[in-house]
Each structure stands twice: as structure tokens, then as C-alpha cells.
Amino acid sequence: MPKTKTLVKICGITSIEQALQIAELGTDAIGIISVNESPRYISSEKKKVIFKTLKDLYPNIERVSVVKNSPIDSIIKGFLGEPNETIIQLHGDEDIDYCQKLKKRIPDIGLWKAFRIKNKKDLEKIKPYENFIDAIPVSYTHLTLPTILLV
């Protein structure tokens, strides 16, 4: 997975109005949090309505579902209904084996794996995943840097 370009993803969308305003600005990807304990969590039904609207009006914007430590069968069953997300972003402790299994089950969906970076040594966690995922959103903790996406 060599770095090819930088993308802009706006995440934590909770309404159609937010999604459309952000889409109008020209973002590359819009993310919805599918993690129950998140304050920005929205239901699968509401997410599907937002993603359908985006798919119809802005088909080139990636639609990202952010999940955390979800069983693979739950992702397949609960998150990939019509209209399909274009990307699943893993934001938990998912290991390489998990990434391989998920990619095998849904080969046509992009797979991103997020990493929390607190120091330079944390960057070493990324390398082993490079051949098993499509992009790496990197969040810096305790730094004043924005989240970056390596694709």
C-alpha cells in the first residue's frame, strides 16, 4: 500500500443536512459513526438514509462507516445494506487476521484501519497492516496536528 494521495474525510455526521453541507464543500469522504458508545453514533436506518441521499446527489463522495471491534458477521449483516457503504473504517483493536477475513468477505468494499499515534514509536504499528488494508487514517493524540489519511 504505497502512499498515493491525500484525501479529506469529514466524520461524525449525524444528519442529512450536515452531510449535504459538507458534500457541497467538496470533501472526498463522509463518515458516519457506527459505534454504540460514541456520542456521535447514529442508527443503521438513519445512516442508510444519509448514505442513499449522498449516493444519489454526490456519487463520487466515499461513504464511510466507522466501526470498532465489531464481529465480522455484524458488519456484513448490519452495515452493508442498500445503499452500500463504499468503505468500512476499523477504529478499534482489530488485528491483521481480522482485516484479512473481513476483506475476503467483502472484497468490493474499501477497508481502512485507523491508528492512534501518541509518539513516533506508534508509527511502527502501521507497517504490518499495509498489505491488508486500503488506507490508513492516522489520528494524533495530544498533538495539534489534524488527522491524516494515507492511501
Residues covered by each model-derived region:
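Basic, often amphipathic N-terminal segments
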Residues: 2-56
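Catalytic beta/alpha-barrel core
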Residues: 33-36, 63-70, 78-98, 110-121, ...
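A structural signal for short coil/turn segments at secondary-structure junctions
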Residues: 58, 82-83, 106, 130-133
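Short beta-strand/loop segments at the ligand-binding rim of alpha/beta enzyme cores
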Residues: 3-9, 58-65, 106-116
